[in-house]
């Protein structure tokens, strides 16, 4: 049998990735458009998140001011067909591909509105959609502002600057909270420019070190807020560029960090062309923040199969003001805060979309009633309805204790500890 050149390149590149680290990735031509969306935050489409509910795909969040929003599409509206093709049974990726296209082209979308069940066919002109990197900016107390930053796509620095300037126009700014929780990172240069909003021109933010030498990234403009008190929120989902912003502000004693230890992704990623319009996203170095510490949590260089070992906090470094900080394993906050406990069962319900399903149903029943998010509380009757709706669904869930018992049983059988099996059986 003949093997195509495309397949040979794909097999070879995939094998390279398996031997190096989990971030080295082969990107064939058909995946490059998704990669571009992740890095630029822009695509041609109608401007909405979508999700699956049963056999159908529904609109999960039309972006404010997007073509979908202007066409009257609301959260929970069901997609019946796209350009005459029934959407029943389709996966999210299939419907997403149909909705996307070149800007200024028309897509015909047949929908069923959630609130009144009315069926409508909309002719929507696609536009160049920019996914907002700053989904929220507002006030949490007199003089204290809060900005949520979700990812480091192209142009997010300008978004951050505009958000700050808008807050300054609204009132006196006495302090600012930057929320980088669950921000997975993105473009390094955007992170450097954001740090430059709060630090003097010429400040070193990060340097990269690899086989081809090192490169130093410094701020290039006068700061917008050189002295404003800053607090930065992080958690174990804060990674890469988010860790660079948080870690550099900590090293420069420019902000206080609160939350949980960050993820620990301090690897430099570069894209190399392979031919046939395919690319290899390759790890080429590591990031080092101003104190000299590296934030990478896993060392993949010492394992033949690219599995890696955890980096133990081993070396002490000093912040600009002389405080002691440690390398390896991500960024440790100045003020550790325990995360709010959420059971694995609740997380499973959320991941499967069952909670959003109930919210849609709730809105359908109560959309005409006055609603104040600051005082809203779910009634006992509504909670019972929610519980019954979950009981009617199949939830593929296994408790942590059940999983631990299964692992104990496997270990006992593998090591021929027959005498333990009876004791394990009593626990089941």
Model feature map: region roles:
Residues 1-25:
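N-terminal activation segment of mature serine protease catalytic domains
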Residues 1-5, 28, 37, 58-62, ...:
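Cleft-lining beta-strand/loop regions that shape enzyme active-site pockets
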Residues 11, 23-61:
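PDZ/PDZ-like peptide-tail recognition elements
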Residues 44, 51, 101-108, 267, ...:
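A short, compositionally biased
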Residues 51, 110-114, 288, 318:
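A generic structural motif
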Residues 61, 90, 123, 283, ...:
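Short linear motifs in exposed loops
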Residues 241, 253-254, 258-260, 264-323, ...:
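Polar, glycine-rich mid-to-C-terminal structural blocks
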Residues 294-428:
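Conserved functional hotspot residues or short segments at active or partner-binding sites
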């Amino acid at each position: 049998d003949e093997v195509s050149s495309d397949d040979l390149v794909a097999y070879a590149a995939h094998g390279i990735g398996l031997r190096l680290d989990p971030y080295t990735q082969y990107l064939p031509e058909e995946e490059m458009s998704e990669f571009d969306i992740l890095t630029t935050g822009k695509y041609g489409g109608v401007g909405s998140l979508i999700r699956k509910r049963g056999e159908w795909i529904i609109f999960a969040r039309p972006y404010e001011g997007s073509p979908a929003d202007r066409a009257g599409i609301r959260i929970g509206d069901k997609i019946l067909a796209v350009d005459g093709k029934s959407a029943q049974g389709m996966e999210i990726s299939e419907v997403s591909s149909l909705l996307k296209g070149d800007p200024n082209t028309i897509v015909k979308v047949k929908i069923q509105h959630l609130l009144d069940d009315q069926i409508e066919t909309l002719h929507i002109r696609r536009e160049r959609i920019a996914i907002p990197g700053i989904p929220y900016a507002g006030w949490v107390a007199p003089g204290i502002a809060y900005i949520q930053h979700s990812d480091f796509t192209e142009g997010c620095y300008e978004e951050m600057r505009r958000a700050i300037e808008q807050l300054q126009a609204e009132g006196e700014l006495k302090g600012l909270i930057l929320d980088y929780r669950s921000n997975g990172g993105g473009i390094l240069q955007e992170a450097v420019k954001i740090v430059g909003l709060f630090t003097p021109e010429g400040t070193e933010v990060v340097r990269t070190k690899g086989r081809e030498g090192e490169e130093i990234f410094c701020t290039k403009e006068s700061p917008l807020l050189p002295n404003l008190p800053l607090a930065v929120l992080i958690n174990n989902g804060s990674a890469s560029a988010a860790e660079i912003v948080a870690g550099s502000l900590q090293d420069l004693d420019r902000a206080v960090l609160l939350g949980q230890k960050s993820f620990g992704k301090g690897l430099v990623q570069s894209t190399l062309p392979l031919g046939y319009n395919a690319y290899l996203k390759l790890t080429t170095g590591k990031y080092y923040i101003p104190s000299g510490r590296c934030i990478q949590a896993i060392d993949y260089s010492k394992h033949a199969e690219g599995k890696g070992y955890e980096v133990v906090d081993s070396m002490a470094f000093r912040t600009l003001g002389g405080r002691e900080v440690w390398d390896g394993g991500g960024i440790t906050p100045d003020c550790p805060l325990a995360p709010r406990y959420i059971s694995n069962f609740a997380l499973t319900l959320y991941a499967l979309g069952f909670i959003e399903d109930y919210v849609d149903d709730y809105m359908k029943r109560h959309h005409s009633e006055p609603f104040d998010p600051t005082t809203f509380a779910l009634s006992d009757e509504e909670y019972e309805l929610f519980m019954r709706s979950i009981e009617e669904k199949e939830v593929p869930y296994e408790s942590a204790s059940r999983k631990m018992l299964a692992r104990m049983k496997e270990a006992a059988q593998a090591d021929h500890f027959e005498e333990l099996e009876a004791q394990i059986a009593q626990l089941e």
